[in-house]
Regions:
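Targeting/processing segments of secretory and organellar proteins
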Residues: 4, 8-11
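Nucleotide and nucleotide-moiety/phosphate-recognizing core
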Residues: 22, 28, 32-136, 146, ...
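Short hydrophobic alpha-helical segments enriched in small aliphatic residues
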Residues: 13-18
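A charged, well-structured terminal subsegment
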Residues: 170-172, 179-192
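Hydrophobic alpha-helical segments within soluble ligand-binding/sensing domains
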Residues: 141-144
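Short glycine-enriched, charge-decorated loop/helix-capping segments at active-site entrances
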Residues: 132-138, 177-181
């Protein structure tokens, strides 16, 4: 099995993980379509903020593999072919807290099984640049994940959580997650 990308010191490195079959080049063609959903907020004021790490990760993946995003129903969408697989990459335009509608629409439209999705999201509970991959699990207080879980009626879908740390004063969580990366953090999360 190929490995899942992991974030480390400003680049993607590879880390084996049994949950996802996305990078397994030996899978049957029938299972070769995947939906990657990066969570974030639309608008220039939110670009490259901690809360938009899902958008940034997808941007890097799509650019690296020669794709481009186009505005479509409920999202910016790109289709990337890589290692014999099709990746539908989705950046919802519904704002973070309403991401479930776009997720469900595109999963149904593209006929992608829930197990062949991956939601990429920021996580305050993880140190900056650390990642966690789970096949299922709670929303951990993340409003984008809450909406997806409510829309799908389950929390049993794969999530890739990128740590953004929690270095903020009491009552400053919103400013922190919607804030731009500090210079020292930027070095850790610079996606290439």
């Amino acid at each position: 099995m190929k490995s899942l990308p992991e974030f480390r010191e400003g680049i993607f490195v590879f880390h084996p993980h049994p949950i996802l079959r996305i990078f397994d080049t030996e899978r049957e063609t029938a299972m070769s379509k995947f939906l990657l959903v990066g969570l974030g907020n639309v608008g220039a004021e939110y670009a490259h903020t901690r809360h938009n790490i899902g958008f940034d990760v997808l941007d890097a993946f799509v650019i690296k593999h020669g794709g481009f995003f186009k505005l479509d129903r409920l999202a910016e969408v790109a289709e990337v072919k890589w290692k014999g697989k099709t990746f539908i990459c989705l950046k919802p335009t519904t704002f973070m807290n309403l991401s479930g509608k776009a997720f469900k629409y595109w999963m149904d439209k593209e006929k992608v099984d829930l197990e062949n999705t991956l939601t990429i999201v920021d996580d305050l509970a993880l140190p900056t640049s650390k990642i966690r991959l789970r096949a299922s699990g709670s929303d951990a207080g993340h409003n984008g994940l809450k909406d997806i879980q409510l829309t799908l009626g389950t929390d049993a879908y794969p999530k890739l959580r990128f740590g953004i740390g929690n270095d903020f004063a009491k009552g400053q969580q919103i400013d922190f997650v919607l804030g731009k990366w500090a210079q020292d953090e930027r070095k850790l999360i610079d996606i290439k």
